[in-house]
């Protein structure tokens, strides 16, 4: 697909109403340094320096859909415990409809704790219930599906075998999809795929497909036989088998097969990559793409996802930058964080001074340009952290941004003073600053040093903060107001 088609896809994605049904869980990350061996046992001692709580399982699917710009609702059952409260809190500010999330006081909310040192996962600790939800809460889920399914454009089933997706629930979801003409896209688990009969498309990996088909998949012929068995037996429209370094293989009910090669890249972490495939594939189908086109976009997104550490999302801007060919010089400046970190590290060894600034840069104007030109004078490389569309909406309101993240990134990348652009989905650029460790952090003159996010981080290793005065009277807010009131002057 060409750049304009991809950009159009993610513009349409903002109108998509997606329902995620499945197992919600919390992902806890304990980041630290492992420099000692315990005197109690031959194990590493990790000195924890940072802790993160993130949405996991079906929650990571939600995160991906929000990052893609969709309107999202969730249907699940969680515990009425502290982790359940943490999980609900993790949805804050995402604009997600949680009316279909039910709390069972007798149930344990799933939580997975990962301990990471030197960018390597050392151990994972699980706290969860794998029992099926009770009949009472199964009825609540079934009632929600019956009452609400018709208002969605696509239904995503995220099965982690934690008990929410009972046979009755799955039967109801697939039946609703067929009845209403809504794609039902399933990330399956387990060995019995009969429970997914009637879904639109399944996205197992090779090992899962081998287990479900009970057939060896060591050759292309074996892969095809297994896929044909699953397609026919489950009455699917299509089957997308992910094959790690070999890409993906799409098998369709009409007999067509499409093999999609992967893009060679360094793999940091496969955690959550399946959630990214599920999300991007579903958005593509909901927007009217045929299976092959949607799978190709999902394959690109998966390649980006595995280059990140931990459960993470992929933004439209990252996908467009990876696919696009229309403006190769500008494209080369737009990087994901992991790729940029490697570049920055190499440039620093050559003695280059890194300058970092960030912002929404919606409706780029002369004030922005002069600000960025001044920022560039403080060092040798200027990296601009760009708020994603989802981040801008949280910060500025539902009517912003006026220009999508992909276009904003390309406009910034076209400026000679900008060396690299990296899109981030958080409300602040703290994670970018911690990772890139710029020597100079630049913010606008309307800030005081104490209010600058990342000041303590930068100063901790000898860097500094610079405040740049904005051009008087030049702001996106002022421009929007002038347009609304018709007071634009030459």
Swiss-Prot record:
InterPro entries: Bifunc_HldE (IPR023030), Cyt_trans-like (IPR004821), PfkB_dom (IPR011611), RfaE_dom_I (IPR011913), RfaE_dom_II (IPR011914), Ribokinase-like (IPR029056), Rossmann-like_a/b/a_fold (IPR014729). One of its GO terms (molecular function) is heptose-1-phosphate adenylyltransferase activity. ATP binds at residues 205-208. Residues 1-330 are annotated as: Ribokinase. The keyword Nucleotide-binding applies. Its EC number is 2.7.1.167, 2.7.7.70. PANTHER family: BIFUNCTIONAL PROTEIN HLDE. This is Bifunctional protein HldE. It comes from Geotalea uraniireducens (strain Rf4) (Geobacter uraniireducens).
């Amino acid at each position: 697909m060409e750049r304009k088609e991809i950009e159009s896809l993610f513009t349409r994605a903002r109108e998509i109403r997606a329902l995620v049904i499945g197992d919600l869980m919390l992902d806890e990350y304990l980041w630290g340094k492992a420099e000692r061996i315990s005197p109690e046992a031959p194990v590493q001692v990790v000195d924890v320096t940072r802790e993160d709580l993130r949405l996991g399982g079906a929650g990571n699917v939600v995160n991906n859909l929000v990052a893609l710009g969709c309107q999202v609702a969730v249907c699940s059952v969680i515990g009425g415990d502290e982790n359940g409260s943490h999980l609900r809190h993790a949805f804050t500010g995402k604009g997600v409809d949680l009316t279909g999330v039910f709390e069972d006081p007798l149930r344990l909310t799933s939580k997975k704790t990962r301990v990471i040192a030197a960018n390597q996962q050392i151990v994972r600790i699980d706290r969860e219930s794998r029992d099926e939800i009770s009949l009472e809460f199964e009825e609540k889920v079934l009632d929600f599906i019956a009452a609400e399914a018709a208002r969605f454009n696509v239904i995503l089933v995220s099965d982690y075998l934690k008990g929410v997706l009972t046979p009755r629930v799955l039967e109801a979801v697939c039946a609703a999809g067929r009845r209403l003409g809504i794609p039902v896209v399933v990330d399956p688990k387990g060995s019995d795929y009969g429970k997914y009969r009637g879904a639109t498309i399944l996205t197992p990996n090779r090992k899962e497909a081998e287990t479900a088909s009970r057939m060896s998949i060591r050759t292309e012929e074996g892969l095809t036989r297994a896929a044909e068995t699953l397609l026919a037996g489950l009455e699917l429209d299509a089957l997308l088998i992910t094959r790690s370094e070999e890409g993906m293989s799409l098998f369709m009910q009409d007999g067509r097969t499409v093999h999609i090669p992967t893009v060679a890249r360094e793999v940091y972490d496969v955690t959550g990559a399946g959630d990214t495939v599920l999300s991007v594939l579903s958005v593509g189908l909901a927007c009217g793409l045929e299976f092959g086109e949607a799978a190709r976009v999902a394959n690109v997104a998966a390649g980006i996802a595995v280059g990140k550490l931990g459960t993470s999302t992929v933004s439209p801007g990252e996908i467009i930058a990876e696919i696009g060919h229309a403006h190769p010089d500008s494209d080369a400046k737009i990087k994901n964080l992991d790729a940029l970190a490697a570049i920055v590290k190499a440039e620093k060894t050559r003695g280059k001074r890194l300058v970092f600034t960030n912002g929404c840069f919606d409706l780029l104007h002369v004030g922005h340009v002069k600000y960025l030109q001044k920022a560039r004078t403080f060092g040798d490389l200027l990296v601009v952290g760009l708020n994603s569309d989802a981040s801008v909406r949280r910060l500025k309101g539902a009517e912003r941004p006026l220009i999508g993240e992909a276009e904003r990134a390309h406009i910034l990348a076209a400026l000679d003073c900008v060396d690299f652009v990296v899109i981030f989905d958080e409300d602040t650029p703290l994670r970018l600053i911690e990772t890139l460790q710029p020597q100079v952090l630049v913010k606008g003159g309307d800030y005081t040093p104490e209010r600058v996010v990342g000041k303590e981080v930068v100063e901790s290793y000898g860097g500094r903060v610079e405040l740049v005065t904005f051009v008087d009277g030049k702001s996106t807010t002022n421009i929007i107001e002038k347009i609304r009131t018709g007071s634009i002057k030459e």
